[in-house]
Every structure is written in C-alpha cells, then in structure tokens.
Amino acid sequence: MAKKKFVENTNWKKIDTDNQLIFEQGGFLGLEEIDPNDYFLTDKNVDKIEKQQKQKQKQEQEQEQKPTNKLTTKSTTKSTPVQNKNQKPVDKKRKSKKGNDDSDNEYSGYQDDSDQDDEYSAAKKKPRIIKPTETVDMGTELLNSFVEGTVHNKKKQRKGIKVKQIIDDNDNDFEDEEEEVKPQQKLQKQKQQEQKQKQPQKQPQQPNKKNNKKELQKEEEEQMEEEKEEEEVQQEEEEEKEIKKPIKEKKVKTQKQIEAAKKNINKLEKIKKRKEISEQKTISKEEQDQLDMSEWNSYNLDPLILKGLRSLGFSKPTEIQSSVIPVAVSSGYDVIGAAQTGSGKTLAFGIPMVQRILQHLRKHGQNVENKANKQQNDNDDENEDVEEEEEEEEEEGRSKEYRKLFSLVICPTRELAIQVTNHIKSIISHTNLKVISIVGGMASQRQQRVLSKRPEIVVATPGRLWELITEGHQHLVELESLLCLGIDEADRMVEQGHFAELESILKTLPIHRTAMSKKERLKKKETEEKRNKRRKVDKLNDKGEMIKGDQDDMDDQIPDEEMEELEQEEQNHLTTTHKRQTFVFSATLVNIPGDGAPTSQKKKYRKLTPIENLIEKVRFQRDYKLIDVTQKRLTAKNLLETKIFCNLEEKDMYLYYFVERYPGRTLVFVNSIDCARRLIPIFNILEVPVFALHAQMQQKQRLKNLDRFRTLDNVVLIATDVAARGLDIPLVQHVIHYQVPRTTQLYIHRSGRTARSDQDGISVVLVTPKERPLYIKLDSSIEHDIGNFPTDIRYMEGVRDRIELAKEIDKLSHQSLKDNREKSWFKKQAEEMDIELDGDFFGENSDDEQSEDTRIAEQKKQFKLKQLRAQLKHLLSRSLLPRGVSQSYITASAIQELESKSQSSAATDFSNKAKNVIGKKAKQLAIENHSKFLTKNKKK
C-alpha cells in the first residue's frame, strides 16, 4: 500500500487526500475514472472531497465491526487451484448497498465504493497455490491481473457514471452530455472485444485434473453469474439508448419547430410592414374625434363609409371627388372623368360603387355592418406566398342570393389592380363587404379558391379575368346582379394591340332590358346620316361661290349579313333588371392637344378616337357626364420640370451624377427592357442600391422590388412604362426620363409618380441630339417651358472615371459569362446526344499554340478584371469631390461649399439657379432703363 505523491503544478489545484492505490489484482484503481473537473478551481471540490473522506471513515468503521469469518472460510476450503476469471461474482448485499449510496451522493458509484469493493475483492480473492516443480510466466500473469482489475473496476463504476449523467442532464448542456457518453460507450465496446480475444490466454496450461463434481458445479455457477452480470450491463446500456433516443428526436423536432416558427414570424412581420405601406394608414381615435367631416355630410353617404373615411383622416374630398360623387350618387349618372395623377381618382369612383352596393343590400333587408370592425382578410395577398386562413361561415343576416358580384373594376397593370384593391378595402373596413384582386403571375387555383368566397367587389386585369371567365367560374359567370363597372386608365386600355380581352369581357356583360339595343342605335344612326347627306347644304368657298352637299350615300349602308350577326349577338346576351353604372377614368383622357382632332378642316367626317370607340363598346346604360378637372398645365403644380441636353455616351454620367449628388427615392424610366438590363449591372458595380421593374419579370419579383423601393430611403428603381400608370409610391422625390417618352400621355403619367398629394417633386429629361425632334413635339404639346437642370461641371471628372471603370468591368464580366454559357450549352447538348467533345474545344489537354494563347488571354483578362475592380473600389472609398478640392488639404471655402452641397437638394438647386437667372435679367433691364433715362436727359 502506497500513499499518493503530490507534484507541484501551477495549472492544477493541490488536493490533500488519503486516497490509497492498490497494485494487486485490482490494477490501477480509479485513475482512469477520476473526473478532471474535480482538480479545477474551488471550494466546491474541496467540500466534496471532505464529505467523501468522512463517508470513507464511517464505512471503514462499519466494516471493521462486521465479522469476516465467512469470507476467510470460503477462500480456504478449496484445496485445488482455480483458474483466473475476468470478473468476480456480484454480491446481492453489495448491490443493494451501492444503490443506496447512489441516491445519497452523486459520485457514490465512482469513488466511494471503489475502496470498499477493493477490500471486498481482496478478501474474497482466492490464493494461488504454486508447486515447486511448476513454472510460471510472470508476464502473462501480470497482464491478466491488470486486465481483470481494470475491467472489474469499469463494471463497478458504470452505475456511478450513469448517476452523474442523469443528475447533470438538463436542457442547457444536453448536447455536451451526449458528446461525453458516446466516446465512453465506444471504449466499453472496444474493451469487451479485447476481453473476448484475450480470454483463452488467461488460462495458463496446468496439468491439474478436475475429479470433484462439486467443484465443477461451482465453476458452472460462477460462469452463469458472470454471464448474467454481462447481460445486465448490456440491458442497462440498451435502456440508456432507448431513454436518450426519444429525447434526441424531441430535441430535433423542437429545434425544427422553433426555426419554422421564427420564419413564420419574420414573414408575418414583413406582411404587416407591406400592408402598412400598401394600405391606407389609419389615425388614432383622438384624432378621429377632432376631424370635421361636415363637407362629406352634404353627399348623403352611408354612415359606414363616413366611418372609414374618418379613420383614414380624410376630412374633405379632393377636387375630382367633389365633382364626381354628387353626380354619381345623387343623380345616378355614368361618369367619364379626367384628372391629374395623385388627385384621388380611385376613391372618386370607389365611394359611389360602395354606396350603391350598400343601398341595394339595405333595401332588401340585408346586414351590411361588420360587428367586429375588423379589416377584411379575404384578399389574396399578392405580395406574399403565405396564405391567410379565412372563415368559411357566411355572415350573419346575409343570404347566398345577396353575396354575388356587384362591382367589377378593370385595370391595365397588376400593380395598379392591387393598389386599387387596397384603397377600396380601406373605406369598407366597417362593412362586411369583401374586395379581392385577380391578376396574372399568381396561382390561378388560389384565386379560384378566393373567388369561391363570393366577394362583392373584384378588381382584375383583363388577361386573368378573361381566363377565369372562359373556364366558367360560377362567381364570374353569374353577372345578372352586376351594379357597377369601373375602367381605370382607360386611354392605356384602348391602345392598339393591347388588351384584346377587354372587348370580349365587355361583350359578356349583361344588358338592361329597357335599354336601346345596338341594332336599334345603328338603325337610328344610319337614318340620321342619310338624312344629313340628302339635305343640300350650301357652303361658301374662299372665292364666294356656292357648293352643294354630297348626295352619295351608298357606301354608308349596313349590309344584311352584319345585321344578322347583331341580331344573334343580342339574343345570346345576358339581360338584367339593374341599370349598370359605369365609371371610365384616366389622367389623360381628354383635353390633350392634337389627340382625336382632325388633320385638316376639309374633311367632313373625322375618324373616331380610341376613347370614343371604348365608349361605344362599353354600352352605357345611363346618361353619362364628362367631368374634366385637368388644368391647362397637365402636370402637377408642385412639380419642377427640367431637362439636360447631352450626348448618348454622357447619359450614364449624368444619371450617376444625379443619383450620387441627390440621394433619395429616384424612379428612372426607360423605353426598352434591354436598356434597363444594361443599366442594372453598371449601377450594381458602382454600389448603388438599384432594382428593376419590367414586364418580363415574374410577378412575385416585381412586387418584391416595388416593396423594397417603398421601404428603403436611398434607392433607385429602373422601370419601363409598366410603372408609369396609377402606382401610388409614397415619397418619390425624383423622376428621371432616361429616354424621351414617345407620347405626351406617357410623359404626364411618368412625371405623375412624384409630386403627389401636395408634395414637392422634380422630373429630369435626358435629351440627346437624336431625340431632339421628339422632345420638341413634347415641349409644344405641354404648353409650358421646361427649364434647364443645373449641373456642377467640376464633379463630372470624378463621375467620368467611375463610369468608365464600371462599364469596362461590366463588359469583361459579361463576355466571360457569355463564353461560359456557350460552353455549358455545348456540354449539355453533347450529353443529351451522347457525343464526346474534344479537349481542344475547351482549350484543355492540348499542346496546340492556339489553345495556349487562349489560356494566356483568359488569364490576362481575369487579371485585368481584378485590377479594374481594385481601382474602382479605391475610387468608391473616397467621397465625390469637385475638381480643385483635396481631402488632404481642406480649406474654409471647401468646408462651406461641402456644407451647402450636403444640405441642398435638386429642387433647391434648380430654384436658386432660376432666381439667379431672374436676378441677372432684372439687373440687365435696370441697366438698360438707366442708360435710356440718361440719354433722354442729355437730349433735353
């Protein structure tokens, strides 16, 4: 018996113990199983060791008092030698005692029982009798005793380790416990395998013979006990695995559920943000109580509509609303309206529609109030993939007969349809009416499911609407109860070659029974034209001679076949008892100079304009009123219109100058998708936050880019004319016409994206010499001057360097991408055709000079690309300063200039320049007047 020697080490804590190490058959007792954490830090470990020492002393005292005669007699009765075994039989008393210690101390099965078990095993150990003539191999004997001792201690201490693991097993360090248990289990399996392999070596060859049957029986019993013990250990290990498996699975499941829940929460937050942006924001109840709604009371609107307007904070109607609502609500006329962009046209036809639906439902005793006063969630949210669950129960007091399609609104673009839906939804928040949008680019199955909820108002684009009508959806086919029809941006809908489905949709709409048929109108028109032609109208020419009217009327007669087609069309048409109310609106509907006017005064009969053709196709069932609130100035009053004359190569420079010089929400319009695709990578290389919006993009991506443009502060959106009409994007400070718009209507609609709702805005037109004739036409049709935008030439040198580098980088990267695409295409085609391509094709595995040249050229290209990117990165890291100003040597004048530039905006710079120009002109006039006055005095 030897005491433990202590070695001084600064990294380990000295612990004084009376622990004894037994180098007999027990092997190196306890060294492998000591927890290294017990040697680190602290007072807790010292307290544990003191408790262990006290427990050892008590156990030693108890063992001394117990009689040990039975153990000695058992060990001495055997006369014959016994073979060495790997493990000793387990005593039942020892097991029960061990179980009690496990409950008292967390390290009980690990250190405390070790000394006790060693004493017990030493007492139970059978003495080995060696004859003088017998030879013994000490190496094998020592090896066998060492293995027996280590294995024996391992088995004894397993339960202590398990107790420790169960106590330390909690939610916070569950994963650490798994990592500790796994290597221990592997070691146990390895040692068991080694044990089985070494078992035949443990029996030294001896010439002893077993003649006694009792001894054989005892040996068999010992073997049986050992086998049972091994089985118990295996069962315990299996139980541990079974216990831990479900815990692991549950943990994994909960982690997955947590991740899914986090994703859903993020999606819901995005939905809320987008809804707040897209929908009209409501005000607080205190602000609602302070609002004066007296101007709305004169229109006799439903109180639920007034509640919705109050919650939005609309205390008074706009000009177009005050002109349309009395005519549509009180008098019941159809309306053809024209107003500037951002003037409230959507609610101008939305309020009369909702008013008529509510009147119809109240007249038939139906419930229209939303008792919960919650906003509708039935709209298929086009901005997200997450579907909102809807209640399938019908509203209280509403029968199925009165849950039909009462109002239909047709819009040219998907984004405009979604915007109109949100505007109408905001005023019906206190009713139980439903409004949805049906647009392309979304799953038709989902939209069919939303239509099955039978919404009263549908806002749609012509393509998807006609698709669902032809499929025979019940809610869109049953149009007998249609009360209102709205067409927004009508001039866009009647453009040649666009929206062919609109005419088919208008033909499917029901006709009022008492209304005049198309056949009758044509007959009446024909008779009037014949009467006018037969009448001799006298006219005077320039010379004063009399001219008679034309009497030829054969060309204007309608053939019989056309009359038969009209009769069949009238028979196939749906009829209704309701007189449908129609609203046709646009910003450039009427009063555009040159549109629809005759080319010469000599022509007696002018050709019908597209709008007049639309009016014929719509089949107004009431008398209509034409309401035009557009002013002589077709754009908004608070819009500053400017221009920049430049060369084609300088357009990118001026665009980057404007974006870098005046940060904010900038909307750039181009005439083609190719132009947008060319600009996007250049501005991405220049690290400008830029997004695209054009017709060839997927609807989901278009909506995402629009939402990003709405949420970010300093951002650029490069768009085609898809974004020119109807979109209400808040706080757009700048609109840049990168290419001159082809028509005046496009210019007005593009410029109308800024300076909305009494906010300031500026539009800039970039004009090249080639586009100058188109700009002259635009300038003459607008009938007011467009000023020159002030540009600081000192900044242009730095802008030019950045643009040239970005263009060169884009060119090289685009060429490499193009080559890679071609190679990948050839590879794909070769794989499909089971053809092997030569290595020369790709410049690989070839000694040809051309292939080496191509490799060298490619390496040079890549090196040059890296160089250019490094140069551009260096330029972008520095602020854009005017020529003559240095970052190293800052002067007082430079500081003042930088402060004024940082605080200025495009509008202020333009207004300051205009003031300076006016001041110069005033000075010149004053000097001229003064000189004239002096000359007069001299003459006198």
Swiss-Prot record:
GO terms for cellular component: nucleolus. Residues 152-162 have a biased composition (Basic residues). Residues 367-376 have a biased composition (Polar residues). SUPFAM superfamilies: P-loop containing nucleoside triphosphate hydrolases. Residues 168-180, 218-240, 378-396 have a biased composition (Acidic residues). ATP binds at A339, Q340, T341, G342, S343, G344, K345, T346. The keyword RNA-binding applies. Residues 50-243, 364-398, 517-556 are annotated as: Disordered. InterPro entries: DEAD/DEAH_box_helicase_dom (IPR011545), DEAD_box_RNA_helicase (IPR050079), Helicase_ATP-bd (IPR014001), Helicase_C-like (IPR001650), P-loop_NTPase (IPR027417), RNA_helicase_DEAD_Q_motif (IPR014014). A motif (Q motif) lies at residues 294-322. A motif (DEAD box) lies at residues 488-491. It is an enzyme of class 3 (hydrolase). Its EC number is 3.6.4.13. The keyword Nucleotide-binding applies. PROSITE patterns: HELICASE_ATP_BIND_1, HELICASE_CTER, Q_MOTIF. Residues 326-607 form the Helicase ATP-binding domain. Residues 68-81, 198-209 have a biased composition (Low complexity). Keywords: ATP-binding, Coiled coil, Helicase, Hydrolase, Nucleotide-binding, RNA-binding. Gene3D superfamilies: P-loop containing nucleotide triphosphate hydrolases (3.40.50.300). It catalyses: ATP + H2O = ADP + phosphate + H(+). ATP-dependent RNA helicase. Belongs to the DEAD box helicase family. DDX24/MAK5 subfamily. This is ATP-dependent RNA helicase ddx24. It comes from Dictyostelium discoideum. The lineage of its organism: Eukaryota, Amoebozoa, Evosea, Eumycetozoa, Dictyostelia. The gene is ddx24.
